[in-house]
């Protein structure tokens, strides 16, 4: 049996991307942002199609993502941050709540969000992961923006067929 299959599309030309970056653990977050923006450019996204905003910490990321999503100006969003374990329960709280908020915004607004909020045991792990995680976030955002647009067209095609059927029935 032959089945239809969508091939991943990493062409970023014309895509509008919003990035929300935490300033807490700033050196790691700057490394994430640098790698992410560099990869977006490599994928064909232009600087004029990227907006980067910063927030104090990971718990503030979902609200900024929500405001960007509400604007309707973006094809995908990217969350960048670093939560590094300390000696208190705060690590679990920040990790879980920021992750849940990021996911909720994406689902509520039907908008892809690449979650590149690192959660690591120590600074060394965060530094070791920041470059590849930043690049990966760019690739995820571009691929998922293209995928959601392609899937949205499936629904548009079905709507057009229904409209044509309705017109034929009236004739």
From Swiss-Prot:
Pathway participation: Cofactor biosynthesis; riboflavin biosynthesis; riboflavin from 2-hydroxy-3-oxobutyl phosphate and 5-amino-6-(D-ribitylamino)uracil: step 1/2
Region (Disordered): 150-171
Biased composition range(s): Acidic residues: 154-171
Gene3D superfamilies (UniProt xref): Lumazine/riboflavin synthase
Enzyme class at the top of the EC tree: transferase
Swiss-Prot/TrEMBL keywords: Riboflavin biosynthesis, Transferase
Amino acids binding 5-amino-6-(D-ribitylamino)uracil: 24, 58-60, 82-84, 115
Binding-site positions, (2S)-2-hydroxy-3-oxobutyl phosphate: 87-88, 129
UniProt family annotation: Belongs to the DMRL synthase family.
Protein's UniProt name: 6,7-dimethyl-8-ribityllumazine synthase
């Amino acid at each position: 049996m032959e089945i239809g299959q969508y091939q991943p599309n990493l062409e970023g030309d014309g895509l509008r991307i919003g990035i929300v970056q935490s300033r807490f653990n700033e050196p790691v977050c700057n490394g994430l942002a640098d790698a992410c923006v560099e990869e977006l450019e490599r994928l064909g996204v232009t600087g004029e199609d990227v907006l980067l905003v910063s927030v104090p910490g990971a718990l503030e990321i979902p609200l900024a993502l929500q405001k960007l999503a509400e604007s309707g100006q973006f094809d995908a969003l990217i969350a960048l941050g670093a939560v590094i374990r300390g000696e208190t329960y705060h690590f679990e709280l920040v990790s879980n709540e920021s992750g849940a908020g990021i996911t909720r915004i994406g689902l509520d607004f039907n908008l892809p969000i690449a979650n590149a909020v690192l959660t690591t045991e120590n600074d060394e792990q965060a530094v070791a992961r920041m470059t590849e995680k930043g690049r990966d976030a760019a690739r995820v955002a571009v691929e998922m923006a293209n995928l959601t647009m392609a899937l949205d067209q499936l629904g548009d095609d079905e709507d057009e067929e229904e409209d044509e059927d309705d017109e034929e029935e009236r004739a």
